[in-house]
């Protein structure tokens, strides 16, 4: 209040306007003042007309003369001692520990996505994303983000998608490796992807079964389940691949020709999972119920509906040890002793080998009438 009174006294009204030809509708209510006071104002930017946008008055500057005031030019933010550039992207607080137990920093996360970025984009590019962000590290507050709520880097692309309530929202997607690095700069650790690309959101091209074990089950049970799912798909005429998720489970997945819509893909995967559970009720369940999952593996088919996501190949997981979701061959899977054995530091060796997921992605398959008929016959048997 004291500041406002001070300001009112300082702004002595003129009797006549300082400009000619002032419109009456303006002049009637205007109070004219001399331009000899200097105010400090916080604001976001100048508009194209030179007007301050989102201005906030901070106080008068009695130490400055009005004749000394000039328009400020934007200045680059000074680089901090712990900042660095990765893949052309400025990474702030690069030394901040993101995985404290593993000693991995924010800069390490960015460098991981620089290394695996080209391969990731080949597999997940142009798909709507859900980012799992941990700005203060995995021990701090973490959250999912799928919409562009403002402040996200330009390296991430946007696509407007109609949601279930009929409203449209801008979703994020990556088109190049620095998209992933830029998201890492914003604290993103995990990248989860849709089963369709932005140019045909109504036509899924990826089908995933996420094998999610109950707490009491051991890795050999999960590994055996992955092979059983693979064999059942093979019996239907479908070839599949495996991704160890960096958590407890395995994704058995295949690439689809874009000939079917979401309803068909969802119904196929639901029927498949329920048949597996019906034929092996002591080992599998096809519902999310925690009570029914006791001692069993949930064959999660729900990844195959519009808007659902699955962890992207080569994405980090926000878990102790900095594990990575890694595609493997069936021969490699047979020799693994866990689903989270790959770490950030193992990626150089992985990148020296051909990518198993690329072989799966290039083997486009279709849910033909013949495949669906085989599934129907199997379900009735």
Language model: regions and residue ranges:
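A short beta-strand motif that forms the metal-chelation/ATP-contact edge
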Residues: 251-257, 298-301
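Core structural elements
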Residues: 86, 246-248
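Long, well-ordered alpha-helical scaffolding segments within enzyme catalytic domains
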Residues: 2-12, 112, 219-238, 265-280
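Charge-rich, low-complexity segments
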Residues: 90-175, 179-184
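Signature for HUH/AEP ssDNA processing cores
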Residues: 172-246, 256-264, 379
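Short beta-strand
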Residues: 132-134, 240-246, 287-291
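Nucleic-acid 5′ end/cap handling module spanning
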Residues: 1-8, 55-60, 220, 243, ...
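C-terminal accessory nucleic-acid interaction domains of nucleic acid-metabolism proteins
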Residues: 12, 16, 22-111, 121, ...
């Amino acid at each position: 209040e004291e500041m406002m009174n001070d300001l009112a006294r300082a702004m002595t009204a003129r009797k006549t306007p300082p400009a000619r030809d002032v419109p009456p509708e303006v002049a009637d209510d205007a109070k004219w003042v001399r331009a000899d006071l200097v105010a400090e104002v916080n604001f976001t930017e100048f508009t194209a007309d030179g007007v301050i946008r989102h201005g906030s008055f901070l106080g008068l500057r009695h130490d400055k003369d009005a004749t000394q005031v000039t328009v400020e030019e934007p200045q680059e933010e000074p680089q901090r001692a712990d900042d660095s550039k990765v893949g052309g992207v400025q990474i702030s607080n690069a030394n901040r520990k993101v995985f404290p137990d593993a000693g991995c920093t924010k800069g390490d996360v960015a460098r991981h996505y620089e290394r695996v970025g080209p391969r990731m984009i080949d597999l997940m590019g142009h798909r709507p994303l859900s980012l799992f962000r941990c700005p203060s590290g995995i021990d701090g507050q973490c959250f999912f983000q799928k919409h562009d709520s403002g402040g996200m880097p330009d390296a991430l692309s946007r696509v407007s998608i109609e949601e279930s309530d009929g409203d449209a929202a801008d979703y994020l997607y990556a088109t190049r490796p620095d998209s992933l690095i830029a998201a890492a700069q914003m604290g993103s650790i995990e990248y989860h992807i849709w089963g369709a690309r932005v140019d045909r959101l109504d036509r899924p091209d990826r089908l995933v079964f996420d094998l999610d074990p109950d707490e009491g089950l051991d890795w050999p049970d999960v590994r055996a389940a992955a092979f059983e799912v693979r064999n059942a798909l093979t019996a239907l005429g479908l070839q599949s691949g495996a991704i160890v998720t960096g958590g407890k489970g395995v994704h058995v997945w295949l690439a689809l020709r874009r000939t079917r819509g979401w309803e068909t893909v969802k119904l196929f995967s639901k029927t498949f999972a329920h048949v597996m559970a019906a034929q092996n009720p002591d080992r599998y369940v096809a519902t999310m119920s925690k009570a029914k999952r006791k001692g069993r593996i949930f064959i999660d088919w729900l990844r195959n509906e519009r808007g659902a996501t699955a962890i992207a190949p080569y994405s980090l997981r926000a878990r102790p040890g900095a594990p990575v979701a890694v595609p493997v061959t069936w021969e490699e899977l047979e020799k693994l002793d866990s689903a989270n054995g790959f770490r950030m530091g193992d990626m150089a060796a992985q990148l020296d080998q051909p990518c198993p997921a690329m072989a799966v992605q290039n083997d486009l398959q279709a849910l033909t009438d013949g495949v669906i008929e085989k599934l129907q016959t199997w379900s009735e048997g």
